[in-house]
Amino acid sequence: MNILAVDTAGKTAGVALLQDDRLLYEVYLDGGMTHSETLMPMIDTCLKLCGLTCADIDLYAVNAGPGSFTGLRIGLAAVKGLAFPRETLCAPVSTLEALAAAHTGEGTVLCALDARRAQVYSAAFDLATHTRLLDDDARAVTDLADFVEKCKKPLFFVGDGAGLCYNKYSLSLIHISEPTRQAEIS
């Protein structure tokens, strides 16, 4: 199965191509241009370098938020435009769930994206069981205090809002985590 994944939720645009469980291509671009200028050339380059066309894609995975409203619209519209002519399946992917899926081990991962004005889009997951502990939501950084303090397992903050959270809470409770590469889309 060929899966083309698109991420336009933040200021960095990303495109990846998976063939079954194997990553064939991955690129992220934060070049100062808008996603409307960069996304389609990124997809075109991806397909050409992998020797594929849109007809070879079995599934499009697209970031469905939370994130930049305009960025999400660009990604969703692009994927809809590519998928529609061949009625190719599309799978919406939570930004925060995708961040969590890149991490493995024991403990809790709290995904945080900067939503500005001292807020983060956040969700939390148990790493061992992949159970969701907090739903996707925009929260004031201070509103996460109860969750952080009650967390009994090692707590890992990930995402571009991790620093905002890290600076608010006891350093003994928190770890910053780097992603583990894996390909799992359900």
How should each PLM-predicted stretch be described?
Residues 1-64:
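N-terminal beta-alpha supersecondary unit
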Residues 22, 89-173, 177:
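Surface "functional belts" at beta-alpha junctions
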Residues 30-38, 69-73, 77, 94:
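Residues at secondary-structure transition points
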Residues 48-55, 84-93:
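Phosphate-handling active-site elements
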Residues 61-89:
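DPxDG-like acidic metal-binding loop motif
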Residues 174-186:
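Single conserved hydrophobic/aromatic residue that forms the stacking wall/gate
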